[in-house]
Amino acid sequence: GFFALIPKIISSPLFKTLLSAVGSALSSSGDQE
């Protein structure tokens, strides 16, 4: 099923890039607040 794909998605470089981008956006928006 779908859940079997989750570890592959999480370990993918694209996901890590996206995650770090989201983290940067969240931390920067938190700094502005």
UniProtKB/Swiss-Prot annotation:
Domain of life assignment: Eukaryota
UniProt entry tagged with the keyword Membrane: yes
Gene Ontology biological-process annotations: monoatomic ion transport
One annotated GO molecular function: toxin activity
Primary site of residence: secreted
Any one of the GO CC terms: extracellular region
Annotated keywords: Ion transport, Membrane, Secreted, Target cell membrane, Target membrane, Toxin, Transmembrane, Transport
Cellular localisation: Secreted; Target cell membrane
Pfam families found in the cross-reference section: Pardaxin
Record's subunit section: Monomer. In aqueous solution exists as a tetramer.
UniProt domain comment: Consists of a C-terminal hydrophilic region and a predominantly hydrophobic remainder.
Similarity field: Belongs to the pardaxin family.
Role, per record: Exhibits unusual shark repellent and surfactant properties. Forms voltage-dependent, ion-permeable channels in membranes. At high concentration causes cell membrane lysis.
Protein name: Pardaxin P-5
